[in-house]
Every structure is written in C-alpha cells, then in structure tokens.
C-alpha cells in the first residue's frame, strides 16, 4: 500500500528542499547552515593571525611621534563623512571591523585609551607582535596551552621587572604631568599646534591643581568647548565654566556681578503633554472666556512656582530643562538672568563648581542652597556666543575654548586634548616614568631573554618569543623615520648589553641616542596597561581552537524551512482537528 504524502510538506514553486545533513522524523535537518565555514585548531590560529597582522599593518604607520595620518571616508547616517586623523582610536570607531580577532584587538586598544588616555597603537602592535612571535613556537607542534602557560610566565616576570626600570624621581609633580601631556600629543598634531595645545593644557592643569585632578571627579574638571573662526593660538583657558546655551530673552541682563545662582533640577512650566508612554492629556475649551481664565490661572500657578526663587534673592537661575515663555518676561522685569537646557553631566559639573545644591522643587529652595560667582557674563568668541561664569565659589573646574579654521580640525584637536587630559590624570595618580624611544621595551626584552635560559621546558621558547615581540617595538619605531629595523635592533642590543638602559630611538635625529640626555620619557602606568591589555588579547586569541562562521541559506531553501517549521506529524494532526 502506497503511503500518502502530506502535500503541505512539499515545496512550493518559489521554494527548494535543502540537502540535509540528517533526517529527523522524515524531515530534513541541518546540523549547520549551508555555506557555514568552519576552521579548527591550526587553521583557526592561522586565520586569526592573518587578521591580527592586518591590524598591525593598519597601526604601525601611526606609531610614535613621526606618525603618518589616515584619511577616513565613512557614512554617518545618511551623509558621507570624511576626516583626517592620526588618532587610531578615532579610526577604529569609524571603520566597520568584522573579523572577531580583529574586533578583539580593536576593543583592547580602545579600552586602554579610554582608561589611560594613550597606548591605543602600542596595545595592537604589542599584541600582534606576541602572536607573530608565538607562530614559530606553534609550528613546532607545541600545544596551545603550553604557549599560554609560557605567556603567563613571561607576563608575571614583566610585571616584576617593569617597576625596577622606572626613572629616578627627580622631577616635581607639575613637570611630570607636563611630560605626560606632551607625550600624549606627540605625533597627533603638527609642531605649531602641539606647542599651543600643550601650553593650554599645562595652564589648565596648573589652575585646577594636582589634588583636584586626582580626585573622584577628575575626568570632569577640564572640559573643552569649540568655536570655528580664528586660529588655535587664540584659544582661551577660562578659570571657571563656559556655557554654550544662549540667553533666551533680549531684556535679560548680559552681565551679573556677585551672582547668587539657583540650580533647578527639572523644569519651570506646566508638565509637557506626554506624562509617560501610557498616559497623555490635552486641553479643550468650548468658550473663549474659559481659555482666557485658563491662561490667568496658568500664570498664577507659574508665579507661585517661582515665588521662592524671588524670595531668596537669586539673580541667576540655571534650569536643567525647559522654562515657560511667560517666565522669561517675568524674570527679565526683575533683572534676573535665566539659562535653560543642560545635559545632566554638565549640570552636575556646574553644581560642583558653584557650590550650589540642585533643587527639584523651587518651593524647597533656601538661601544656603544658592551658589555664587563673582561674574556671569555673555561674551562673543569668534562666530559664537558663550556665557562665562568666573570667580566660582568652589573653583574646581576649568574650561578651554578652542578656536580653529573649521569644525573638522577642531574635532580632531578636541579628541587629542581629551586623551591628553586623561593621560595627565593617569600621570598625576602614578608619577613614575620610564625611558621612551623604545628603551624600556628593549631593556625588558634583554632581561626576559636572560630569564628564559633558566626555564627547562618548552615554555623557554615562548618567553624568548615574548622577548622578541618586545624587541620589535623599537624596531617599528625606527621604521617610521626610515631606519633599518635590523640595524637598529643590533645597535640597541649592543648598547643595552653595556648597561646603557636609556638607549633608544632618537626620532628627531634619525639615530640611536640616550633618552636620559634627550629627556624622552613615558608613563609607566600607561606602559603597564598596554602590556596587560596586549597579553589578555593575545592569550584570548590563542585559546580559540574552532572558528565557525555561520552562513545563510539561499532564499528558496530559507523560505521552505521557515514555512515547514513546526510541521511535525503531531502538530499537523492538531491543525486538522481544529479544522474539523
């Protein structure tokens, strides 16, 4: 007897039955989607290493003070975006990286920059150099876990050696911070801009003081505002706060001395139409007199709302959200300056600088909640108008007003400055320095190589590979100024073997020099973070022994599988029973 086939399981005209891996209950089943790519063990390592080497090639030309620049064309929303930068973090955030290993390296680099303000390029280069050096050990049929154990051993030894290579403490704290700022800016700006920005940041840090820079709110102490027009040399350092908000009423004062400032957290108006996503309201009037009466009551309500503000004699009011138009005239007649609409982070920053308390309900305001400033004044800088608040009650904030030819140039300078501010905070917290120019990495490589001789198993090869990876860092730095990597490595080995621990690459004179004579130093804390991030990324990639890249079925096969999903015999019987 011929078994009857359920026609619902047959493909339609636009469908096709995929070739199955196995059959379950008479239906085709796929263990992996068609077009899935799978690479295991050595093939997986080779694939990940190729992605890592691509990232190394992307980063090595923007390594060091003599770095090149990248021209990036991307699409931001509907509009194409073109910008020029030598900041690798900006490039990584704009380009779309798809390979998982490359994404991991990019994430490690961005995390280092976000944490310490620098080290983005060094993280990628060191991680990829470690992987490249381990490739030789891997090809000798060394198990991945043995390589990982060797990397862990090398990392522990580096963490023990690195603090011993710190430069003797002979600089004051301010000078150490200036060195850190200068190093962060090197190569990211042209020489003239470098001097201007370095001076701006040094002046700003001197104003806020090192104690405030290392405090819990250190990241918000120095902020950057921008205005196009003029040159970078015309930029300002303001001992106080600069607001980009405009004064909303022409009759309000443009200059207030001995300001008493109230901060209202919320809005000074009737609540907006939408209370929340499930509740809304609107007003309807069936007679003009009712509308007139409503306006009168609305004004009476608003006057009662701000009565306490007038009572405490505040002459400047900062409101986080909106203000009713009626109140603009109300305050203007009383000579009170109102500024509205602040981002939450900036509002908190203003509160700390003024020594004012943020009040959610104006009726709760008391004189002790007010902040104070010697002067609140509107000024025009370039094409834009700003409100300057100086002589604050708690002077813990400094704003830098950047001026430049266009917004593209200003955006790049702003990114670089914020990274330099972060590095200044890092150096202020940990002022230890090491010799720059690749001298630190070369000395670590020499000591690691010596340490590896005492390891009796295959981990010795891994530690030597790590030493080779560190030794390649000054070689890469030398390549950026046109020197031969092998010649530089040989000369550095010779000089470090004679005890010249500060011998490194002099990028200004294209030669080998003593960094102690040139005064070239880097932050030890940044170096340690780079090493930590690079080792974590390299070990994570080495742990990968299977790469499965999911593919997609062709449309006819995908349509067929979507339609018959859930069409087991039991479910078909249930559907038939419902139809009966």
Language-model regions, residue ranges each:
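Extended, low-charge hydrophobic alpha-helical regions
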Residues: 46, 96-98, 399-401, 406-580
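Active-site cofactor/substrate anionic-group-binding motifs, chiefly glycine-
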Residues: 78-112
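P-loop NTPase nucleotide-binding/switch module
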Residues: 23-38, 103, 499-516
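Phosphate/ribose-phosphate-bearing ligand recognition and processing surfaces
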Residues: 137-152
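Elongated alpha-helical scaffolds
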Residues: 103-106, 118-132
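Residue-level signature of catalytic and energy-coupling elements of molecular machines
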Residues: 64, 117, 141, 201, ...
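Short, flexible active-site-proximal loops enriched in glycine and acidic residues
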Residues: 115-125, 144-147, 163-174
């Amino acid at each position: 007897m011929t078994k009857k086939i359920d026609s619902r399981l047959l493909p339609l005209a636009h469908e096709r039955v995929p070739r199955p891996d196995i059959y379950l209950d008479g239906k085709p089943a796929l263990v992996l989607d068609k077009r899935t790519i799978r690479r295991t063990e050595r093939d997986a390592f080779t694939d990940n290493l190729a992605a890592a080497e691509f990232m190394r090639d992307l980063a090595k030309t923007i390594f060091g003070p003599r770095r090149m620049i990248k021209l990036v064309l991307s699409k931001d929303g509907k509009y194409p975006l073109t910008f020029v930068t030598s900041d690798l973090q900006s490039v990584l955030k704009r380009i779309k990286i798809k390979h998982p290993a490359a994404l991991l390296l990019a994430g490690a680099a961005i995390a280092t920059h976000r944490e310490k303000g620098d080290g983005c390029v060094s993280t990628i280069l060191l991680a990829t150099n470690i992987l490249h050096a381990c490739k030789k050990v891997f090809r000798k049929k060394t198990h991945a876990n043995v390589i990982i154990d060797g990397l862990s051993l090398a990392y522990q030894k580096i963490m023990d050696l690195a603090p011993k290579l710190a430069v003797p403490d002979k600089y004051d704290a301010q000078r150490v911070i200036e060195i850190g700022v200068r190093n962060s800016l090197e190569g990211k700006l042209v020489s003239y801009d470098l001097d201007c920005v370095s001076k701006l940041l040094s002046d700003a840090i001197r104003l806020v003081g090192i104690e405030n820079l290392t405090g819990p709110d250190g990241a918000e102490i120095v902020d950057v505002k921008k205005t196009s027009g003029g040159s970078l040399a015309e930029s300002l350092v303001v001992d106080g706060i600069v607001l980009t908000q405009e004064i909303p009423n022409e009759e309000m004062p443009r200059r207030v001395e001995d300001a008493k400032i109230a901060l209202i957290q919320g809005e000074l108006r009737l609540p907006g139409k939408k209370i929340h996503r499930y509740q809304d309201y609107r007003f309807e009037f069936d007679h003009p007199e009712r509308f007139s009466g409503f306006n009168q009551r609305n004004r009476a309500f608003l006057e009662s709302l701000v009565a306490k503000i007038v009572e405490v004699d505040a002459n400047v009011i900062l409101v986080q959200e909106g203000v009713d138009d009626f109140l603009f005239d109300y305050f203007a007649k009383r000579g009170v300056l109102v500024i509205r609409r602040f981002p939450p982070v900036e509002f908190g920053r203003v509160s700390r600088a003024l020594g004012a308390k943020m009040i959610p309900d104006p009726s709760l305001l008391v004189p002790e909640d007010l902040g104070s400033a010697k002067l609140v004044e509107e000024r025009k800088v370039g094409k834009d108008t700003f409100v300057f608040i100086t002589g604050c009650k708690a002077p813990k904030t400094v704003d830098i007003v950047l001026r430049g030819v266009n917004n593209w140039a200003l955006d790049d300078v702003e990114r670089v400055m914020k990274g330099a501010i972060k590095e200044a905070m890092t150096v202020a917290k940990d002022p230890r320095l090491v010799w720059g120019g690749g001298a630190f990495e070369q000395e670590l490589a020499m000591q690691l190589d010596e340490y590896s001789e005492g390891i009796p198993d295959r981990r010795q090869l891994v530690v030597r590979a790590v030493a080779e990876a560190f030794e390649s860092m000054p070689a890469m730095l030398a390549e950026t100024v046109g020197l031969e990597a092998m010649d530089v490595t040989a000369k550095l080995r010779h000089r470090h073997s004679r005890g010249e621990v500060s011998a490194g690459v002099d990028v200004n004179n294209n030669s080998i020099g003593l960094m102690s004579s040139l005064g070239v130093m880097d932050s030890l804390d940044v170096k340690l973070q780079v090493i930590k991030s690079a080792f974590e990324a390299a070990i994570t990639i080495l742990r990968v022994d299977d790469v499965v890249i999911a593919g997609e079925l062709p449309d006819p096969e995908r349509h067929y599988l979507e339609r018959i999903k859930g069409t087991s015999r039991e479910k078909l019987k249930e559907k038939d029973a419902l139809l009966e």
